[in-house]
Amino acid sequence: MAREKVLELVKRVTLPVVQEAGLELVDVEYAKEGGRYYLRIFIDKPGGVRIEDCQHVSEKIDRLLDELDPIPQSYFLEVSSPGIDRPLKKAGDYIRFAGRLARVKTFSPVEGRRKFTGRIVGMHGEDVVMQVEGKEMSIPFKQIASARLEVEF
């Protein structure tokens, strides 16, 4: 099965399990590293996830994936929090994390550039609003290739 199909199937199977546990499915990754395959599922909830949350989701997903067997190779299943530099994947993330510092990369230039680091203001319609270098700017959500929270000390 192609990588994209694997990710799509895993997300479809994982989402109800994660939601049933009162958690958010942040992201799913399938990667080959050092000759080994890894399926990583990132979960979160307000206040952060506990090891018990990860264990619960891991056990349920492991059983479901064993039944479906979508991945022909042997792989390691990892379930964890997305970390303090979590990716911002959904429009709602920019509302939830308003006031936080983020790094954003766009598919094509916005106001002449593709990389931005600034404070998230929120969403305005379909645009992410950020305070970048003392100036408020709007970045179309559909133009965002990747975005992550930045660690502040």
UniProtKB/Swiss-Prot annotation:
Gene name linked to the record: rimP
Record's function text: Required for maturation of 30S ribosomal subunits.
An example Gene Ontology biological process: translation
Keywords assigned by UniProt, alphabetized: Cytoplasm, Ribosome biogenesis
Subcellular location: Cytoplasm
KW rRNA processing (keyword) present: no
Pfam families (alphabetical): DUF150_C, RimP_N
Family according to the record: Belongs to the RimP family.
Chief localisation class: cytoplasm
Superkingdom, natural source: Bacteria
GO cellular component terms, semicolon-separated: cytosol
SUPFAM superfamilies for this protein: YhbC-like, C-terminal domain, YhbC-like, N-terminal domain
Name the UniProt record assigns to this protein: Ribosome maturation factor RimP
